[in-house]
Amino acid sequence: MNFLLCIFKGVYVIKLIQRFFKLESAGGILLLFSAVVAMLLANSPLSNQYNDFLNLPVSLQIGSFSINKTLIHWINDGFMAVFFVLVGMEVKKELFEGALSTYQQAIFPAIAAIGGMVIPAVVYWFIAKQDPSLANGWAIPMATDIAFALGIMALLSKQVPLPLKIFLLALAIIDDLGAIVVIALFFSHGLSVQALIFSAVAIIVLILLNRFRVSALCAYMVVGAILWASVLKSGVHATLAGVIIGFSIPLKGKKGERPLDDFEHILASWSSFVILPLFAFANAGVSFAGIDVNMISSPLLLAIASGLIIGKPVGIFGFSYISVKLGLAKLPDGINFKQIFAVAVLCGIGFTMSMFLASLAFDANAGESVNTLSRLGILLGSTVSAILGYLFLKQTTKLN
């Protein structure tokens, strides 16, 4: 009897887990859970073990070629490159077939995204300009965490109109494109010509695979792995390889199959339930030891938090409103400016993307206090934006 009861409980738990992973908000919830666990570990008696685990040396060697990184660097440079493969595929799909496929569809979220990148950077610069050592952090509040923002919106999925969801997705995708450009232009150092040549050859092979509409995903994975390793060695940030790989996968194969859709379907679950939660676990572990009230007035913390809480909504809403009034763009049917403002606030959730940019802007040499304060600023700004964004979205969709 007890044995049957255990089996029944086991089946019930499995069904609950399956039901959870089918939720639209499951990725966002898991992301938040991972961040909370990381913060708890970083401020517990297990903090040393947590940090030692993240700094475990991990090496990959094939003949004379080797990559030696700590575990956290493998997560940030390797796993996040896989995430950017997914981003690249999503951007390509939207550009050719989706919400960004026509000028009329693309211009409104594009202008909004530009405002959402420029104004947060200006807000950051205005607050942090007194300290030249903080100059590199201007890009941190530019980013939007797609998974988290969509996760919050999914909590109100039945109330939110479809055009508003499409606007958020298009806005976040263009935002990611901006982040990719920033990484390429400002966070690539000490370039290796030899590695860049290998990268160029790999890119040419990917272009040929795409040109001949090769559907075998293993071919893109093998060449993509070579491209990633070459880009990593070149001094350009390795996540850019992910975007190139994503763009190289064809929308349609020779026999009408859809390799991009197939690969996107595979990676979407890995990204939501493994890669992003793992990234949050590795990067959200902020230790509060030695932190006092005076740190709240730190220019770095204030600059990042203000960029996310104030800069994002002001930039997105302001540019959107002005573009419509000047006749440069048209407000999508079925949504109003109050809802645009709610989404603009929601886009202040920088979280994993902002932490990623912070890890590039301030390396280990910047000092523990700088890294801690930057992560605190991101957590504060993202948390406030998530709460306010949810409340505004709930109110505006309810009124609608």
From Swiss-Prot:
The chain crosses the membrane at residues 26-46, 71-91, 107-127, 137-157, 166-186, 189-209, 225-245, 273-293, 299-319, 340-360, 373-393. InterPro entries: Na/H_antiporter_dom_sf (IPR023171), NhaA (IPR004670). The keyword Signal does not apply. GO terms for cellular component: plasma membrane. Keywords: Antiport, Cell inner membrane, Cell membrane, Ion transport, Membrane, Sodium, Sodium transport, Transmembrane, Transmembrane helix, Transport. It comes from the Bacteria. GO terms for molecular function: sodium:proton antiporter activity. It is found in: Cell inner membrane. The keyword Transmembrane helix applies. One of its GO terms (biological process) is regulation of pH. Pfam families: Na_H_antiport_1. It is a multi-pass membrane protein. It catalyses: Na(+)(in) + 2 H(+)(out) = Na(+)(out) + 2 H(+)(in). Belongs to the NhaA Na(+)/H(+) (TC 2.A.33) antiporter family. Na(+)/H(+) antiporter that extrudes sodium in exchange for external protons. This is Na(+)/H(+) antiporter NhaA. The gene is nhaA.
